[in-house]
Amino acid sequence: MEKYSAESIKVLKGLEPVRMRPGMYIGSTGKRGLHHLVYEVVDNSVDEALAGYCDWIRVTLHEDGSVEVEDNGRGIPVDIHPEEGRSALEVVFTVLHAGGKFSKDSYKISGGLHGVGVSVVNALSEWLEVRVHRDGKIYRQRYERGKPVTPVEVIGETDKHGTIVRFKPDPLIFSETEFDPDILEHRLREIAFLVPGLKIEFEDRINGEKKTFKFDGGIVEYVKYLNRGKKALHDVIHIKRTEKVKTKNGEDEVIVEIAFQYTDSYSEDIVSFANTIKTVDGGTHVTAFKSTLTRLMNEYGKKHNFLKKDDSFQGEDVREGLTAVISVYVKNPEFEGQTKSKLGNEEVKEAVTKAMREELKKIFDANPELVKTILSKIMSTKQAREAAKRAREMVRRKNVLQNTTLPGKLADCSSTHREKTELFIVEGDSAGGSAKQARDREFQAVLPIRGKILNVEKSSLDRLLKNEQISDIIVAVGTGIGDDFDESKLRYGRIIIMTDADIDGAHIRTLLLTLFYRYMRPLIEQGRVYIALPPLYRIKAGREEFYVYSDQELAEYKEKLQGKRIEIQRYKGLGEMNPEQLWETTMNPETRKIIRVTIEDAEEADRLFEILMGNDPSSRREFIERHALKVKELDI
């Protein structure tokens, strides 16, 4: 038995706890956490911009896998810290909870973690180098895995001011260390919209691309950008106010800025920020926005005779087709979770409600035609929702009669043990027929679907439910959709989408994923939705047979089998395989290949669906042209 004494108790010093438990500080050590490192450094530069000391930021992706963030702010202080007895620069990069944010005099508003942020970035980097232009001198210090390897030294003179941070993520910490320029570009564009007049340059030296973002129109311009390709029903509505609020520490100010616009689309798009930090999970500002808008539209609905006395709009009616950007600035933001994805300040709710009620009443009372346009849109949504409810009730009534519940084309499995069962949604009747013969009837069910199904991105809920193929999928899965989703009624443990390996197959796969993403999202979040990977080729070499799943694999086999006589058969569709081959290659759990569909960042997935499935062909073309050379097979 090992001795358990004082020596067994490990004390983590400096940045060791960050390296031991990185997820606690940046959320994950996957793609999301990796990009979070860049956001932390950029957020510090943004705080300088918000304080009025910086109007330019440059982010550069270097060929060696490092990233550099430069600004023209004041430059991090380099003088000796009174408590630590060493340069403030070194303190900021090596001590948690050190930095300008914690002194009320340095920043009135800040979003970046200031010190927590850059010290965490330093801890999780293979190396980091910081240069500061300040007081006529250039200072530099280098760190490796969070530890200084050089002192703070003067390396030259300058007439500039600002900070340059360059770092390379540590492969010992991160599962992948390659930055995705699209993800960074998305965030940098967001910041430029939120801080009007701030110029952000982004250079990707790996792919040789340069972009500049500067938007003097602020969040009004942001709403127009989000609505490109959609038909707007009116001009963007914009409000901005500073509200005095009571807090635990007395009285504070909250700056509330909101821009919104209705379009002819069927989905809502609400993007929210607190101190420029994106609040993916919303918070008190979003809750207040939604409830205040719903209350106001109900008041005006009755005033303009759209609603009877006892009738009302629901929140979902008011938000369909709505695009909104909500940006608040608060002195002491309370973010829930280490990665700051939800705002918790109660006083913000009061500020947003008051600002919205007073400002929107002024706008609506001065523009009755604007109000009527919005109310007409909301009214048609309400009527469609009520029609969809009737259609859902019809689907439910069908469900009661057990023998007519399930679609006629569904070949069900015999097992009632949900977690062991699988539903294959198969493209085409002929492949569906082969799959029915190939399957293991004990635990595998097969539902064939015809050709191209309805595009759910462009369809209203009642139209969706009238579509026979979508209705078949909903009934077979069993959970219901949207607000009626009930996980306990799920009929299968896994849902596997099986389509041809061609463009049409990819299109149907995308449509099906859109259906699950928009209306049965918990199934994706729980990791229950999969994509089957049928082989692209069959190679015959003498008596041996190989199934090949990619062009790269084919090239490897050709090299390996050099000198032998080989026959190569390309499968254009699932229907070209006989049931035995289909079982062996695509359905047998022992030998098949399947990809689990995940939503690491729901917003990114949503953006992809919006581009590929929405109404803007130019965005779709730009996306495809941009990625066609990089990606052999686009898995979405």
UniProtKB/Swiss-Prot annotation:
Site note Interaction with DNA applies to: K452, N455
Domain of life of the native organism: Bacteria
Under the heading CDD domains, the entry gives: HATPase_GyrB-like, TopoII_Trans_DNA_gyrase, TOPRIM_TopoIIA_GyrB
Class of the enzyme per the UniProt entry, highest EC level: isomerase
Which E.C. number(s) belong to this protein? 5.6.2.2
Q: Which reaction does it catalyse?
A: ATP-dependent breakage, passage and rejoining of double-stranded DNA
Question: Any one Gene Ontology biological process term?
Answer: DNA-templated DNA replication
> Which residues participate in Mg(2+) 2 binding?
D500, D502
Cofactor: record remark: Binds two Mg(2+) per subunit. The magnesium ions form salt bridges with both the protein and the DNA. Can also accept other divalent metal cations, such as Mn(2+) or Ca(2+).
Cellular compartments per GO CC: chromosome; cytoplasm
- GO MF: ATP binding; DNA binding; DNA topoisomerase type II (double strand cut, ATP-hydrolyzing) activity; metal ion binding
Give start and end of each Toprim domain. Answer: 421-535
Annotated positions binding Mg(2+) 1? E427, D500
**Quaternary structure and partners:** Heterotetramer, composed of two GyrA and two GyrB chains. In the heterotetramer, GyrA contains the active site tyrosine that forms a transient covalent intermediate with DNA, while GyrB binds cofactors and catalyzes ATP hydrolysis.
General remark = Few gyrases are as efficient as E.coli at forming negative supercoils. Not all organisms have 2 type II topoisomerases; in organisms with a single type II topoisomerase this enzyme also has to decatenate newly replicated chromosomes.
* Family under the similarity heading: Belongs to the type II topoisomerase GyrB family.
The UniProt function text for this chain reads: A type II topoisomerase that negatively supercoils closed circular double-stranded (ds) DNA in an ATP-dependent manner to modulate DNA topology and maintain chromosomes in an underwound state. Negative supercoiling favors strand separation, and DNA replication, transcription, recombination and repair, all of which involve strand separation. Also able to catalyze the interconversion of other topological isomers of dsDNA rings, including catenanes and knotted rings. Type II topoisomerases break and join 2 DNA strands simultaneously in an ATP-dependent manner.
User: What is the name attached to this protein's record?
Assistant: DNA gyrase subunit B
Organism this protein belongs to: Thermotoga maritima (strain ATCC 43589 / DSM 3109 / JCM 10099 / NBRC 100826 / MSB8)
